Amino acid sequence: MASNPTTARVCFATLLTTDSYVPGALTLAASLRATGTSHEIICLVADGQLSRSALERLELTFDRIVCVPILQSADTANLALLGRPDLGSTVTKIGIWNLTEYARIAFLDADTLVLGSIDSLLDMSNNDMAIGHDIRPNGGMENAGLLAAAPDLGWPDMFNS
């Protein structure tokens, strides 16, 4: 059954895998609230990876904290090429696909600063997807630092066929 986009539960979400991004995540939440959004703002946290004090600060700012299992990329060669071995845990953001209680989620990296309303990302139909486009000197590539889509546990199966 299709959900009604005007009444369905939707949210903005971010992910933290270390304490070092807590200031950015707090800034992201504050910048979203400054736009006047009425939508839920949630924070996914890698299970067992953040300090108690970091979690307490997040609980005061976000509407909901969701613990997700940490995932690590086994692609050490490409992480080394990027010079960013710390990005290995960014695949943990795939945990948003499990949040099927939401009809739509707009995922934003924790170091994002929102300067104006982006509520329209949550108003799109469930058949639409928005991905931030990142321009690089070697050509364009998609940046999953901004992703708006409808969670669906069956979605990853597309890649297995």
Kindly label every feature range from the protein language model.
Residues M1-S161:
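Glycosyltransferase catalytic domains, chiefly GT-A lineage
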